Amino acid sequence: MVKGGNGSRKRKGDRFELAVVKDQERIGRWAAKLRQGGGEVVDIVSIEKCQDGRCTAHSHVSHVWLIQAKVGGYMNPVERERLVMEAQAISATPLMAWKDKGIQYKDIS
């Protein structure tokens, strides 16, 4: 029996994505893990009520982050470009999340 294959890696990735959602909620944002399946580049959407008044949508004020969670901390250039394009299309901020003594975030715009 082979251990540590794609199934194990997927479960590890799923657990990390849920940890990122919980971390986003901890810092005061609403967050949701997206259903995956068609090669989607966005793993998590996170929204925070805007405190600086720089953005409005239907008289609601918020900031939006599109997050790609990478357990190993590496995002290939194609994924990076796709995430940036998705974020630009809706005026969101693209973030990569990775694990290094807790959850770290990097704005990749």
Predicted regions and their residues:
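Catalytic phosphate/metal-binding cores of nucleic-acid and nucleotide-processing enzymes, i.e., regions
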Residues: M1-S109
